[in-house]
Amino acid sequence: MSDLTVDPQHPWPGLASFTEETRAYFHGREDEVNELARRVQRKLLTILFGQSGLGKTSILRAGIVPRLRREGLCPVYVRIDYAPESPSPSEQIKQAILRATASSGRWTKPGTAVEGESLWEFLHHRDDVLMDDAGNAVTPLLIF
C-alpha cells in the first residue's frame, strides 16, 4: 500500500492508516484525539486498545502524535523484533530512541548506548537533555 496517494481528490487511505503526512485529511476524531492527548500528558503509561480496524493507528499517527510533537514531545515508535538473532528488547528500545531523537533535536551531551547497560540506566545516567532547534527541552515519548 506504499504507492497509495492521499490527496484532495483521494482523501481516504483505504485500509491503510492515516499518517502524520496525511493528517490534513484526518477528520471527525477530534474529541478522541483531545482526550487521549490529555491522558498521555497526565499519565506515565497510557494504553490505547480496541478491536482491529477501529482506527487506533490513525488516531495515534495523524491525531495525537502531531499534537504532542508541537507540545514538546518526541515520538519514538518501537517495534520489538523477537527473532533469535535480534538484539535484546532493551537494546532495540535504546536504538529506537537514538534514531528518533537524532531527527528531532540534539542532546546536550551526545552519546550512545553503553553495551550491557539497562534501559533504566540508559534513560537516567546520561544527565542529558534533548533540545529542539529553538533551545526548548523535548521529551521522548515511547509508542509500542
Regions found by a protein language model. Give the residues of each.
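Amphipathic helix/helix-loop-helix segment enriched in hydrophobic residues with interspersed Lys/Arg
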Residues: M1-F144
